[in-house]
């Protein structure tokens, strides 16, 4: 199987690459990575044909979504599929109010549940 091979996604008119890039690591899960490393990870995935990116507000308290947007902003939007999650809203927070675990040096947000 090739990472760039496209497969139909469910019963909708959408195709995604066989391999996707799960972005929890760029949200600094378990250990911190710098911006250069994050950018390089996105570029490496792109260079290998990956066009499916999965992120979530909870990954690094918003850091993963920021880095995903930063790295993909110059790519043609019709060339990739971006998935995220619902149910958690990010709100600005003071650093001392945040329980980072298991994230390292995460974004400055707290999470609230909202399934409306």
Task: Describe each region flagged by the PLM.
Residues 93-98:
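Short aromatic-enriched loop/helix-cap "lid" or pocket-rim segments at secondary-structure transitions
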Residues 24-36, 100-116:
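Active-site mouth loops of central-metabolism enzymes
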């Amino acid at each position: 199987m090739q990472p760039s091979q496209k497969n139909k996604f469910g019963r909708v008119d959408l195709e995604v690459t066989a391999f996707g890039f799960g972005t929890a690591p760029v949200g600094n899960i378990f250990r911190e990575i710098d911006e250069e490393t994050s950018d390089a990870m996105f570029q490496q995935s792109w260079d290998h044909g990956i066009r499916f990116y999965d992120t979530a507000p909870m990954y690094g308290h918003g850091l993963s979504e920021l880095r995903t947007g930063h790295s993909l902003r110059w790519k043609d939007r019709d060339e990739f599929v971006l998935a995220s999650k619902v149910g958690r809203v990010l709100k600005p927070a003071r650093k001392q109010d945040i329980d980072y675990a298991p994230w390292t040096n995460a974004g400055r947000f707290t999470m609230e549940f909202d399934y409306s």
